Amino acid sequence: GTIPCGESCVYIPCLTSALGCSCKNKVCYRN
């Protein structure tokens, strides 16, 4: 929840979700 994954999720889901990232405020975060 605090580390940006360098990916946005405005139009598509986080592809980095496989790495433990989740969408928050239109940006993918990890932890």
Curated annotation (Swiss-Prot):
Superkingdom in the source lineage: Eukaryota
A Gene Ontology annotation in the biological process aspect, one of them, is: defense response
Q: How is it modified after translation?
A: This is a cyclic peptide.
Q: Where would one find the signal peptide in this protein?
A: none
Question: Where does cross-link Cyclopeptide (Gly-Asn) occur?
Answer: G1-N31
Q: List the disulfide bonds.
A: C5-C21, C9-C23, C14-C28
State the UniProt keywords alphabetically: Disulfide bond, Plant defense
Alphabetical list of InterPro entries matching this protein: Cyclotide, Cyclotide_bracelet_CS, Cyclotide_sf
Q: Which Pfam families match?
A: Cyclotide
Q: What does this protein do?
A: Probably participates in a plant defense mechanism.
Q: What is known of its domains?
A: The presence of a 'disulfide through disulfide knot' structurally defines this protein as a knottin.
Q: Which family is it part of?
A: Belongs to the cyclotide family. Bracelet subfamily.
State the name under which the record lists this protein. Answer: Cyclotide mden-N
Q: Which organism is it from?
A: Melicytus dentatus
At the highest ranks, the source species' classification is: Eukaryota, Viridiplantae, Streptophyta, Embryophyta, Tracheophyta
